[in-house]
């Protein structure tokens, strides 16, 4: 992921305007919340958009997915991530954060968190230390379980001390891929999971085609992969978090929760984009319920 300014973002859009593309609401936490909503969990989303076309699309997509949008408004433009996918299914992002980074800690209140059971936050918010820390403080004050996706290895490297501090003080569940986990601990996947779980309640490290590992209380659970034909890996980690948090919220074991995440991740990488098509969800829900 590469952060870019508005001018560069528009230049990229002009460069690729003749390629096939789709336009959907996105963002790591947004993708995760969409997955949870599709699984039948009542959800809300806190964020900031602008009064522009992208902001309208974002809000309508949230509402259509039965997500309660708690959206503040500001200028200059709604943030956007341009996902560029290579023939071997890998992807990179040119991300213009726009009004998303205008969300301030002062705008968050305890009432926004009341009535919920779990708060999931993406590591990209670490751009504003005060915002991410206040959101976690309020979530804990409201009695919520908290989860954090580390987002990107470069985000971890640039904010290591701060991330380690908030994980140890406010976070119950950490999600990371191998690169992010190594950046966070300096250790390979399994050792990283155990190390991170010393700082929080549960650590999940996703290891791509090898599956994932989950650590808690000094114990490690290894989760095998599910066969899938990789087309686009965008959203794989986000949908894994959807499945895992669904399982956790419904009292499933860590192994079954991780398998739920694996099932969703395997499905989304067979599609273009970070969302699973509506027609796929009935079968996925049955698979997860049968765990």
Which residues does each PLM region occupy?
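Hydrophobic beta-strand scaffold residues
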Residues: 43, 69, 146-147, 203
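Glycine-rich phosphate/adenosyl-contacting loop at the front of the ribokinase-like
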Residues: 1-44
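Conserved phosphate/ATP/ADP-binding segment of small-molecule kinases
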Residues: 137, 142-145, 151-222
């Amino acid at each position: 992921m590469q952060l870019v300014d508005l001018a560069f973002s528009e230049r990229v859009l002009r460069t690729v305007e003749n390629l096939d593309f789709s336009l959907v609401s996105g963002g790591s936490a947004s993708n995760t919340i969409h997955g949870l909503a599709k699984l039948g969990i009542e959800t809300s989303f806190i964020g900031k958009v602008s009064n522009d076309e992208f902001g309208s699309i974002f809000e309508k997509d949230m509402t259509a997915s039965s997500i309660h949008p708690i959206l503040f408004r500001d200028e200059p433009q709604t943030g956007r991530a341009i996902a560029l996918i290579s023939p071997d299914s890998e992807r990179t992002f040119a991300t213009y954060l726009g009004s998303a980074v205008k969300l301030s800690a002062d705008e968050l209140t305890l009432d926004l968190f009341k009535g919920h059971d779990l708060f999931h936050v993406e590591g990209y918010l670490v751009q504003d230390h005060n915002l991410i820390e206040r959101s976690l403080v309020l979530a804990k004050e409201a009695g919520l379980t908290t989860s954090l996706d580390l987002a990107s290895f470069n985000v971890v490297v640039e904010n290591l001390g701060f991330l380690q501090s908030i994980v140890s003080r406010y976070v119950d569940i950490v999600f990371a891929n191998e690169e992010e986990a190594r950046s966070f601990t300096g250790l390979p996947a399994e050792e990283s999971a155990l190390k991170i779980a010393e700082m929080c309640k549960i650590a999940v490290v996703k290891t791509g085609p090898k599956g994932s590992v989950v650590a808690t209380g000094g114990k490690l659970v290894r989760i095998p992969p599910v066969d899938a034909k990789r087309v686009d890996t965008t959203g794989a980690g986000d949908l894994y978090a959807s499945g895992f948090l669904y399982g956790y919220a419904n009292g499933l074991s860590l192994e079954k929760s991780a398998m739920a995440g694996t099932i969703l991740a395997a499905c989304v990488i067979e599609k273009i984009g970070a969302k699973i098509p509506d027609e796929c969800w009935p079968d996925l829900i049955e698979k997860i319920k049968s765990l």
